[in-house]
Amino acid sequence: VEFFIDRNDNLYVNEIAPRVHNSGHLTINAFNVSQFENHIRAVCALDQIPLKKLSNAKMINLIGDQISFYRKSPKFKDNEFFFDYLKKEVKEKRKMGHITTLL
């Protein structure tokens, strides 16, 4: 379940999906365990590893041709992590990758 909280502390349900979700990709770098590992553990009936935040983080999605600029960027800061999904075709509204920044 993907939730969002606005500035007035209102809680919104955006999507219910029985899979890992884009909004949780920052767990790869900012938590002790990624959503991917705990998802596989759940599917295999293994114990979940309790999530512990290691760092605050923000994530930006790279949509469509935005990916082209970052594919050419030779340098990222030590706290920036670039993920290119390596999709063969760039489409206008397609998520092509993301960048996680540890704060």
Predicted regions and their residues:
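Active-site "cap" helix and flanking loop/linker of ATP-utilizing ligase/carboxylase catalytic domains
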Residues: 1, 6-8, 17-65
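Peripheral (often C-terminal) accessory segments that flank ATP-dependent C-N-forming ligase machineries
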Residues: 41-103
